[in-house]
Amino acid sequence: INIVSHSMGGPVTLFWALNLRDKNSPRLQKFVPIAGPFDGVIFTDDVPNQNRIKENGEPVWQNAAYQSYYEKRDDFPKGVSVLNIYGNLEDGTNSDYLVTNASARSLRWLIKDRVKYYDEKMIKGPMAQHSKLHENKQVDRLVNNFLFD
């Protein structure tokens, strides 16, 4: 199966892949999280520019959910292709208003050793706002090209 998710659908898919998937589950082939808050949500447990991604890809700050994902990282299915899409309003917050770029990009550290392919695409400007990302033509093109080319 291919899964395209928005917002909390990303962590829900990750949780499924790490904890609920079994031998009878469909094989995950492609995963496209859009604006996935894998390591915090602004106004809940994250603050703009509080966290950053180290040069090696590891997030400096890791919330409890992220730590639990990390402990189970070896259960992520091998051979999945991932396109991680996130937004940057370019207003100094390094976020899409609800999800920081660091939170979205923290997915790589969790699954980098398991995936066949991993890429990240930052969408910039007003149409990179959290709820507008899934209505964005640039995002539509990226998703279609990734899934069908």
Predicted regions and their residues:
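C-terminal catalytic-base region of ester-bond hydrolases, centering on the histidine
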Residues: 75-149
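Serine-dependent carboxylesterase/thioesterase catalytic core
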Residues: 1-79, 96
